[in-house]
């Protein structure tokens, strides 16, 4: 029992197959489990290697993002006087549109309604005059 327990502990620690052979010379089932653990360890290394490659790609993307930000800052630095003016112009346009368009549209609709009512009365009056 102690040798089997020692084998399990050694397999968990990842010792070499030579150490397994030295400890487990009496049992024949133990080397079979040792080879099984070593075959499982090999794919784990390849999976870990793939994850490492993905991390490198992420770093490259982050570097590209920072580079773009730096370019924007460099372009904005010479045009510092024009950038605030553009922002003010956009704000002025927004306020101007909000103040002018809804008020004009409401007045136009109200004028159309009153104009239509006046047309109806005018159309009804001439029709009544020839009959009388």
UniProtKB/Swiss-Prot annotation:
Q: Which domain of life is it from?
A: Bacteria
The record's keywords, sorted A to Z, are: Periplasm, Signal
GO cellular component terms, alphabetically, are:
periplasmic space
Q: Where is the composition biased (Low complexity)?
A: 20-45, 76-90, 100-109
Q: Does the keyword Cell cycle apply?
A: no
Instruction: Specify residue ranges for compositional bias: Basic residues.
Output: 62-71, 110-119
Which stretches of sequence are listed as region Disordered?
A: 20-132
Signal sequence interval, chain numbering: 1-21
Q: List the disulfide bonds.
A: none
* InterPro entries found in the cross-reference section: Acid_shock
Q: Does the keyword Chaperone apply?
A: no
The subcellular localization recorded is: Periplasm
Main localization (coarse): periplasm
Q: Pfam families, alphabetically?
A: Asr (PF06392)
Q: Which residues form the propeptide?
A: 22-90
Instruction: Describe the PTM.
Output: Proteolytic processing gives rise to the active protein.
Protein family according to the UniProt entry: Belongs to the Asr family.
Q: What biological function has been recorded for the protein in this entry? A: Required for growth and/or survival at acidic conditions.
Q: NCBIfam families given for it?
A: acid_shock_Asr
Q: Which HAMAP family match?
A: Asr
Protein name (Swiss-Prot/TrEMBL): Acid shock protein
């Amino acid at each position: 029992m102690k040798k089997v327990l020692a084998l399990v502990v050694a397999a968990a620690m990842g010792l070499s197959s030579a150490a397994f052979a030295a400890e487990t010379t009496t049992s024949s089932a133990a080397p079979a489990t040792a080879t099984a653990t070593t075959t499982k360890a090999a794919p784990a290394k390849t999976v870990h290697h793939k994850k490492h490659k993905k991390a490198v790609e992420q770093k490259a993307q982050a570097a590209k993002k920072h580079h773009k930000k730096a370019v924007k800052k460099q372009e904005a630095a010479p045009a510092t006087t024009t950038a605030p003016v553009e922002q003010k112009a956009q704000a002025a346009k927004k306020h101007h549109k909000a103040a002018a368009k809804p008020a004009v549209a409401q007045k136009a609709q109200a004028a159309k309604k009153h104009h239509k009512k006046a047309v109806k009365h005018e159309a009804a009056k001439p029709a009544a005059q020839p009959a009388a």
